[in-house]
Swiss-Prot record:
Its cofactor is heme b. GO terms for biological process: mitochondrial electron transport, ubiquinol to cytochrome c. One of its GO terms (molecular function) is metal ion binding. This is Cytochrome b. Heme b b562 binds at H83, H182. It comes from Sotalia guianensis (Guyana river dolphin). The keyword Transferase does not apply. It comes from the Eukaryota. Gene3D superfamilies: Cytochrome Bc1 Complex, Chain C.
Length: 379
């Protein structure tokens, strides 16, 4: 008798995606982050659902409803901090996943890559509107500063900002709609993730060498299911350690002060995972220029497949490209540090140099080095 998992219409889909899926035998732990992102998404949706049961999206009660969750709801503090730190784990996995794609040339699967960039933008939007919900000082001022950037768009800017705010400032209407967005977006992310997987399974996974591995495939289960379970346990362990020992390590103390439109915090800054983009935004002394640089810092990922000049897909056998890749990582860490610093000397000039280097590496240096490596190999 044929196995039910191979014949049942629904089981067949799951079987082909997670059980009998032919997978390259050589993929390393860098390929774990896809499944970890799926786990993060499930955890965020579940903790978020329980938080939404007790949260009130109203300016007069939002802050106290979060305090109520932490004080009065059974394990409410735990759910709240799991959700807040879960977002940080989500972005750590996301950046590692993108870094893996850049290093091993996974971006050559163009449909999968483009859906991935769309997923990144959607996750960033979700995190941004979510950060506004506790209605602390940084929530309010973060929302004001970031939405205000749209006013840099010529002609329609001001109208657009007021339309998003639902009034002439960030207020009740803004909070309500941001809650609605924060609730719906994770489900859009889930749908996009399914499409991401669909396109990936059309081509099969890449591997560290970047060479087609059709002649050396193994079934996903049990080999990679057990490997993914190990990754999941490490992720959960890290998240629990963060949540139970230092829940506020990655947060901002200003967000424990209720939102006050009459008092501006000394340093307005987003959560750590947006600091690199915030540093690029601040490094240009022009509003529209800064907004364009901010957008381009993320959207540049779309152009990476077009900037591939090397005849080798992966960086595994390309030491010069590896050097530039790790320089890019160091540059992004520098930008992250600068984004959290006040706007004064020497941080301004360091931020500007790091921003220039970021675009220079991706648009000029990496493609050029790819060509040089081809020459060295006489290709």
């Amino acid at each position: 008798m044929t196995n039910i998992r191979k014949t049942h219409p629904l089981m067949k889909i799951l079987n082909n995606a997670f059980i009998d899926l032919p997978t390259p035998s050589s993929i390393s732990s860098w390929w774990n982050f896809g499944s970890l992102l799926g786990l993060c998404l499930i955890m965020q949706i579940l903790t978020g659902l329980f938080l939404a049961m007790h949260y009130t999206p109203d300016t007069s009660t939002a802050f106290s409803s979060v305090a109520h969750i932490c004080r009065d709801v059974n394990y409410g503090w735990f759910i709240r901090y799991l959700h807040a730190n879960g977002a940080s784990m989500f972005f750590i996995c996301l950046y590692a996943h993108i870094g893996r794609g850049l290093y091993y040339g996974s971006y050559m699967f163009q449909e999968t890559w483009n859906i991935g960039v769309l997923l990144l933008l959607t996750v960033m939007a979700t995190a941004f509107v979510g950060y506004v919900l506790p209605w602390g000082q940084m929530s309010f001022w973060g929302a004001t500063v970031i939405t205000n950037l749209l006013s840099a768009i010529p002609y329609i800017g001001t109208t657009l900002v007021e339309w998003i705010w639902g009034g002439f400032s960030v207020d009740k209407a803004t909070l309500t709609r941001f809650f609605a967005f924060h609730f719906i977006l994770p489900f859009i992310i889930t749908a996009l993730a399914a499409v991401h997987l669909l396109f990936l399974h059309e081509t099969g996974s890449n591997n560290p060498t970047g060479i087609p591995s059709n002649m050396d495939m193994i079934p996903f289960h049990p080999y990679y299911t057990i490997k993914d379970i190990l990754g999941a346990l490490l992720l959960i362990l890290t998240l629990l350690a963060l949540t139970l020992f230092t829940p506020d390590l990655l947060g901002d103390p200003d967000n424990y002060t209720p939102a006050n439109p009459l008092s501006t915090p000394a340093h307005i800054k987003p959560e750590w995972y947006f600091l690199f983009a915030y540093a690029i935004l601040r490094s240009i002394p022009n509003k529209l220029g800064g907004v364009l640089a901010l957008l381009l810092s993320i959207l540049i990922l779309i152009f990476i497949p077009m900037l591939q000049t090397s005849k080798q897909r992966s960086m595994m056998f390309r030491p010069f490209s590896q050097l530039l890749f790790w320089t890019l990582i160091a540059d992004l860490l520098t930008l992250t540090w600068i984004g959290g610093q006040p706007v004064e000397h020497p941080y301004i000039i360091v931020g500007q140099l790091a921003s220039i280097l970021y675009f220079l590496l991706i648009l000029v240096l990496m493609p050029t080095v790819g060509l040089i490596e081809n020459k060295l190999l006489k290709w």
